[in-house]
Every structure is written in C-alpha cells, then in structure tokens.
Amino acid sequence: DITDYLREGENVISVQVFRWSDASWVEDQDFIRLSGIFRDVSIYSTPEVRVRDFSVVADLDENYEDATLDIEVDLTNYLKSNDEYTVEAMIYDEDFNPVLDSPISVSTDFTDATDYNEDATRKVVNLTQELKSPEKWSAETPYLYTAVITLKDSEGNEKEAVSTKFG
C-alpha cells in the first residue's frame, strides 16, 4: 500500500517488464514462457535528477598487469535545469576497504544535455582511472571489487548512490 506516499495531483507509477535474464535466475528454469509480472515487485522513488543507468568496465593491459577502469554514468534530469552536479566513484576491495586514495569525480551541468523524453533531459558522463596490479577474477579465484557511484548537487548534498560489483 503506497497511499501515504502519493501527493495531491497527478502521480506516476512506472512498470518495466524484462523478458530476458539478468542472471539472477535462468530464463525458462521453471518452464514459464511468457512475459508479464509473475514474480515479486518492488517500488521505489528516485530524485528528480538521478542516475538512470551506469556501467563499470575494467580492461587489463596487454601484459595482464594493470587495468583501466572506465565508468559510464547516464544521468536523467526531470527538473530540466542546468544546475551543476558532481558524479563520484569510489572503488572498494572484497573487505570493503578503499582501493583509491580519493574518489574519481567529474562535475557537469546539463547545458549540453539531450532530450530523454518530453519530461526530462539526459547526459552521459565518463570517469576513467588506472588501477595498478588489481586482483584478477577467475573461476578459481573469483575476486570482486565494489564500485559506489554517488551523485551530488552543487552544495555537495548526496542525491543518489548506486553500486555494483565487478572483476
């Protein structure tokens, strides 16, 4: 029941149904060959300027020693303002100890944003960091790092944080 979270006027609840696997369960594992909502559903709110999507890719050099970490962050702005925001990324090891001395960061505004839809604009930002001698993931030693990506407004207030594991 989300009644307490509704505001006076129009409220929008979006539903997105994926027909492909996200690796959390194997498609067709239970012989269901249909689309639709047949599992648990969760609902959450997001800020008006938010991280719509992101990717983290670690690419090893030709000697398999060091890596280049490329992080792409897709921002959506429902305010359609040109305020400045900062995207920060911090990398943690398996014990959640920081790998970097300080977060990778980039500041951006939406002056050159593209239209996402009639209600929002969109901007993609990229962060890059060299990683010296990272632990390598393999089937024998499946080492995973955690990337935490934070979106902050011009006053340094955290608006949203997302994370993923990578290796």
Region spans (language model):
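Secreted/periplasmic carbohydrate-active enzymes, especially glycoside hydrolases
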Residues: 1-167
